[in-house]
A protein has these predicted regions:
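Short active-site oxyanion
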Residues: 40-43, 200
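Structural motif corresponding to the C-terminal cap of alpha-helices
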Residues: 27-34, 188-192
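Conserved P-loop NTPase "ATPase switch" module shared by AAA+ and STAND
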Residues: 197-209
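Short glycine-rich phosphate-binding loop at a beta-alpha junction
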Residues: 43-48, 204
Length: 258
């Protein structure tokens, strides 16, 4: 599908474009002169079920043709390369486990928070764990943060952080979905570096806002037949805007930061 090049294949669509429609049109155009089975060899990785359904609907609208293999980011962990990675625990089970641990902490330290906040605290810790695992940030890195005059509040927060630490590193607890996804991406990156897929792999619709997804995008972009298609890319951003993105404190939430 792609001619050999020395640069990474990174494409983008501008804000306001009908991303699935333009994506399908581009794939069809690139395969006009190729054998019918060429499109069926393509693996198209997208980040939401809604986009996957829309892409499939656009192909189903005709004309009849062989279709690419459409996968979600989370489907990548279902292949033989990652069969030995344990399945992730359900989000509900993890929240119930966190609720029990938070309850025990509040029993020992009743001044930390009211009992009525038990479930909210468990939800907050679950969200924190997802973000930490998605970014590859261990609890030790957060514990070492210099928070200055917030030391009293921070000391209380660290007691809750110790609960999160229970689920990091070697433990008897099952993997969270984010932790498993990171292991899957690390495994695929290693396998692909040794034996790259011969067929095209296209990751479309992701910006790399999560660390795990960014790592996957980097791995795909390095493949001989890999490509990225970015959504909502601002091709008109001035040079000064690109310079501003180098400041993580002010630009981290920008979709083109990474």
């Amino acid at each position: 599908m792609f001619e050999p090049v020395t640069k990474l294949r990174v494409f983008g669509l501008p804000p306001g474009a009908d991303f699935p429609k333009v994506l399908v049109a581009g794939l069809v155009e690139r395969h006009k002169t190729l054998p019918p089975e060429a499109l069926a060899r393509v693996t198209l990785v997208v980040n939401t079920r809604r986009m996957a359904r829309r892409i499939r609907a656009l192909f189903d609208a005709g004309p009849a043709r062989l279709l690419p293999k459409i996968q979600l980011l989370t489907d990548l962990g279902k292949g033989p390369e990652t069969a030995d990675i344990p399945a992730a625990v359900s989000p509900l089970q993890r929240r119930l486990e966190l609720t029990q641990l938070v309850s025990g902490l509040l029993d020992r330290e009743p001044d930390l928070a009211p009992r009525a906040a038990l479930y909210d605290l468990a939800d907050s810790l679950a969200s924190l764990m997802d973000e930490m695992q998605g970014e590859g940030v261990p609890p030790e890195a957060i514990a070492k943060l210099d928070v200055g005059d917030q030391s009293g509040h921070w000391a209380r927060s660290l007691q809750f952080l110790q609960i999160v630490q229970t689920f990091f590193g070697p433990s008897d607890h099952a993997l969270d979905a984010e932790a498993r996804q990171r292991l899957v991406v690390e495994r695929l990156a290693k396998v692909w570096a040794a034996t790259p897929p011969a067929a095209p792999v296209i990751l479309a619709g992701s910006t790399g806002s999560r660390g795990t997804t960014l790592a996957l995008m980097q791995a795909v972009a390095q493949l001989p037949q890999g490509a990225l298609i970015l959504p909502g890319f601002d091709f008109e951003m001035p040079v000064s805007g690109w310079h501003d993105l180098s400041n993580a404190m002010t630009a981290e939430d920008h979709p083109q930061f990474r």
